[in-house]
Amino acid sequence: MNIFRLTGDLSHLAAIIILLLKIWKSRSCAGISGKSQLLFALVFTTRYLDLFTSFISLYNTSMKLIYIACSYATVYLIYMKFKATYDGNHDTFRVEFLIVPVGGLSFLVNHDFSPLEILWTFSIYLESVAILPQLFMISKTGEAETITTHYLFFLGLYRALYLVNWIWRYYFEGFFDLIAVVAGVVQTVLYCDFFYLYVTKVLKGKKLSLPA
């Protein structure tokens, strides 16, 4: 495992922990898109079904279990534990416009036409756009809490580091996964505007807002 993969995983884990702590400590999920979190839970569920069929390493298995457990814990906090604080009026992105095309694409473009491979491909495509409901929600409300922006920053950093990881693996291992790379580029591009606002506003102590 190279340093970019490791730091990418740690950034991803940091984002998840920041979000869970934000919700738990504030006893509120205000400003958090439940729809994005449901999509991420679906991403991890469909991606890590190989937990039942293969073992790569203790690290790999542990991270998969952590991602799945944390994603469902987040969904539970939003839709059950702190349901009264969930801002459903602004979390209105039509997720079917993401799931249906992604589902169709995963059947058409994949590495192998087998159930696990199609589901893995579906998860890769879906993850690339799963943050859209959250960004859409921020654009509707006009701003985001600082802690929420930190969550988004580490989530975007994770994907950017994974892009570097794939470049590293291509040059030093000869490994190249076109599906993962293209989806990763799409996901990183979606964060570009946010990264700019994060650096120019949040790091200077200002509130973040996205153009409506």
UniProtKB/Swiss-Prot annotation:
It comes from the Eukaryota. It is found in: Endoplasmic reticulum membrane; Golgi apparatus membrane; Cytoplasmic vesicle, COPI-coated vesicle membrane. Residues 25-32, 80-92, 136-149, 200-212 are cytoplasmic. Pfam families: ER_lumen_recept. The chain crosses the membrane at residues 5-24, 33-52, 59-79, 93-110, 117-135, 150-168, 179-199. The keyword GTP-binding does not apply. One of its GO terms (molecular function) is ER retention sequence binding. Changing H12A: Loss of binding to the sequence motif K-D-E-L. The record marks R5, S54, E117 as: Interaction with the K-D-E-L motif on target proteins. One of its GO terms (biological process) is maintenance of protein localization in endoplasmic reticulum. GO terms for cellular component: cis-Golgi network; COPI-coated vesicle membrane; endoplasmic reticulum; endoplasmic reticulum membrane; Golgi membrane; membrane. Binds the C-terminal sequence motif K-D-E-L in a hydrophilic cavity between the transmembrane domains. This triggers a conformation change that exposes a Lys-rich patch on the cytosolic surface of the protein. This patch mediates recycling from the Golgi to the endoplasmic reticulum, probably via COPI vesicles. PANTHER family: ER LUMEN PROTEIN RETAINING RECEPTOR (PTHR10585). This is ER lumen protein-retaining receptor 2. The gene is KDELR2.
